[in-house]
Amino acid sequence: MTATLERRESASLWGRFCDWVTSTENRLYIGWFGVIMIPTLLTATSVFIIAFIAAPPVDIDGIREPVAGSLLFGNNIISGAIVPTSAAIGLHFYPIWEAASVDEWLYNGGPYELIVLHFLLGVCCYMGREWELSFRLGMRPWIAVAYSAPVAAATAVFLIYPIGQGSFSDGMPLGISGTFNFMIVFQAEHNILMHPFHMLGVAGVFGGSLFSAMHGSLVTSSLIRETTENESANAGYKFGQEEETYNIVAAHGYFGRLIFQYASFNNSRSLHFFLAAWPVVGIWFTALGVSTMAFNLNGFNFNQSVVDSQGRVINTWADIINRANLGMEVMHERNAHNFPLDLASVEAPVVG
């Protein structure tokens, strides 16, 4: 006797919708996080494209001197940007209905806040969607954990830093030259290059690139040939096969002889954990560093650390960097301040 089990049809439209959202058979997994992710990222992307092309100038410093960022107002792909929300708005939530008109909303840089808040919500939901799909497939959760590093970095520059500085106008502009301007001003005001957490981030990014290149080249160079010399080595493998495609012992032996034995991994799991953890931890630290510098806990300051027996300063490289920082700072918001804060906060020396 044969028993036939039929899949029970969900009685309601809502039930069928739930089944569709959580199905792992879809070409692209939706998930409950995806229900929020899709509209928020579509909104952020659409507004970014429209504003990058056609947004009018924005009064970023709140001093009635609008700065143009869009293509139709004289910029190109390199110089164009979504200009941050005006300092006159500060940290206020500024949706379109809070402004007297759309023109006022555009003048005060409303699109920046709209894009950033939707984008951050969207990428957080993307991270949640990674966890959700892993959970439904019975996988471990580390893909979402790794993605938390760029999410933390984006949150630091687009949300935590403006909160610490008191205004969305201090957030990173959404453009190529705007990003570099943000970096230069950040160095001038916070000496980020002398912050240990930024140094860890640099080691994470560049080290991760090096390790990725080393791993990929070693694996590609130690493939197990399953074909003749007249055929491509790639023809000897099929997706999902049980057999290994490369010889980790050969790769370990090569690298162990190239440097020394214990510089090479002989365990695939520990190797791939290291490849994932190195850049992720580095970027976590950088995001943490930016978040602390947001509240003006800045990089190390070794200015005027060396003096002679008469108390005269002997300039070191730290003093050269400090002079460069001051130079960058006086060029930033040059019409908003008479002097940068570092120069205005001390009494002028007596000359004579």
Swiss-Prot record:
One of its GO terms (biological process) is photosynthetic electron transport in photosystem II. The record marks H190 as: Stabilizes free radical intermediate. The record marks A344, S345 as: Cleavage. The modification N-acetylthreonine is found at T2. The record marks Y161 as: Tyrosine radical intermediate. The chain crosses the membrane at residues 29-46, 118-133, 142-156, 197-218, 274-288. PROSITE patterns: REACTION_CENTER (PS00244). It is found in: Plastid, Chloroplast thylakoid membrane. This is Photosystem II protein D1. The keyword Repressor does not apply. Chlorophyll a ChlzD1 binds at H118. Residues 345-352 form a propeptide. Photosystem II (PSII) is a light-driven water:plastoquinone oxidoreductase that uses light energy to abstract electrons from H(2)O, generating O(2) and a proton gradient subsequently used for ATP formation. It consists of a core antenna complex that captures photons, and an electron transfer chain that converts photonic excitation into a charge separation. The D1/D2 (PsbA/PsbD) reaction center heterodimer binds P680, the primary electron donor of PSII as well as several subsequent electron acceptors. GO terms for cellular component: chloroplast thylakoid membrane; photosystem II. 2 of the reaction center chlorophylls (ChlD1 and ChlD2) are entirely coordinated by water.
